[in-house]
Amino acid sequence: MDCRLGCGACCIAPSISSPIPGMPNGKPAGVRCVQLNEDNLCQLFGRPERPKVCHDFKACPVVCGKTNQQALANLTELERLT
């Protein structure tokens, strides 16, 4: 599955403990990554500064659902459970 352009759920819902340019301590769950632009696109996509955890995340129907809202809800619940 390819990511839905403009979704951004994986850049909002989960906590990320790795440093991110502009967020040296990572980001807490539910906080929008500073690298997510106004169109919900990662400004680091394809760049070496992108955290490994972000690079390694692969979209899948179970997590991402059929809509951006489903993806955000699913990832928020997974974060809550961990």
From Swiss-Prot:
Superkingdom of origin organism: Bacteria
Pfam family, one: CxxCxxCC
PANTHER family (alphabetical): UPF0153 PROTEIN YEIW
Family: Belongs to the UPF0153 family.
Identification of the protein by name: UPF0153 protein VC_1057
Organism of this sequence: Vibrio cholerae serotype O1 (strain ATCC 39315 / El Tor Inaba N16961)
